């Protein structure tokens, strides 16, 4: 399947076994968002809430932007930067739950909820962190499916 098995643990505390399976051809409930003119899909199962984004509530810890609108503050991912696009409108924050804790995805708009058929990433895109696949949406557009767990891993490794 192309997944991973991660083993870890601490002496006296136990062993952690993490089985990571890739998104395969499946129907996935998502929240479609827009960022820098592109359609992005966020898996609904990971969404905690939506908030209005206010740049005044961003604090920096080193190179990591944090959203202070929640307690504790959470790391932010500006998806226009992830896409390599010019700065977007940055109106909304999608707070998601990941294996490493909560984080915020900053987007321009919400397009709505949609169940989409996931197409696994092709060879060119397979190694891109944060990319979980693609889908043709109901209106015929291509939506990039985000993998919030990998986005959070990118921030921690940066």
For every predicted segment, state its role.
Residues 1-158:
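Glycine/threonine-rich ATP-lid/beta-loop region of ATP-binding domains
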């Amino acid at each position: 399947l192309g997944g991973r098995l991660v083993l870890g643990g601490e002496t006296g505390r136990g062993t952690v076994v993490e089985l990571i399976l890739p998104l395969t051809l499946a129907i996935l409930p998502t929240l479609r968002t827009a960022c820098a003119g592109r359609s992005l899909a966020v898996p609904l199962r990971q969404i905690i809430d939506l908030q209005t984004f206010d740049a005044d509530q961003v604090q920096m810890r080193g190179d990591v932007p944090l959203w202070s609108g929640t307690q504790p503050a959470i790391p932010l991912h500006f998806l226009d930067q992830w896409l390599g696009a010019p700065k977007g409108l940055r109106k909304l924050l999608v707070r998601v739950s990941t294996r490493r804790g909560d984080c915020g995805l900053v987007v321009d708009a919400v397009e709505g909820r949609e169940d989409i058929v996931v197409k696994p990433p092709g060879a060119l895109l397979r190694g891109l962190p944060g990319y979980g696949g693609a889908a043709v949406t109901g209106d015929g557009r291509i939506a990039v499916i985000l993998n919030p767990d990998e986005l959070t891993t990118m921030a921690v490794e940066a």
